[in-house]
UniProtKB/Swiss-Prot annotation:
Keyword Phosphoprotein among UniProt keywords: no
Entry keywords, A to Z: Ribonucleoprotein, Ribosomal protein
GO cellular component, one term: cytosolic small ribosomal subunit
Disulfide bonds: none
SUPFAM superfamilies for the chain: Nucleic acid-binding proteins
InterPro entries in the record: NA-bd_OB-fold, Ribosomal_eS28, Ribosomal_eS28_CS
Name of the protein: Small ribosomal subunit protein eS28
Key word Manganese present: no
Superkingdom of source: Eukaryota
Gene Ontology terms describing biological process: maturation of SSU-rRNA; ribosomal small subunit assembly; translation
Family to which this protein belongs: Belongs to the eukaryotic ribosomal protein eS28 family.
């Protein structure tokens, strides 16, 4: 295990489940809000999640800069 290459993990709470996507509906598009930010600076992202997910679930995000494209 390489301890020199540590990755920062951000916790995010699912605020809204938008739709199912993917060729077989295996991916769910959700809106998440980052935890641990200041009250006036809530930051939300649109993410694709593989597997079961519900509103108010907590996700561990390794990459927090990229946002998923909105699907119809």
């Amino acid at each position: 295990m390489n301890t020199a290459a540590t990755e920062t993990v951000q916790l995010a709470k699912v605020t809204e489940v938008l739709c199912r996507t993917g060729s077989r509906g295996a991916v769910t598009q959700v809106r998440v809000e980052f935890l641990g930010t200041a009250q006036g600076k809530e930051r939300t992202l649109l993410r694709n999640v593989k597997g079961p997910v519900r509103k108010d679930d907590i996700l561990c995000l390794l990459e927090t800069e990229r946002e998923a494209r909105r699907l119809r």
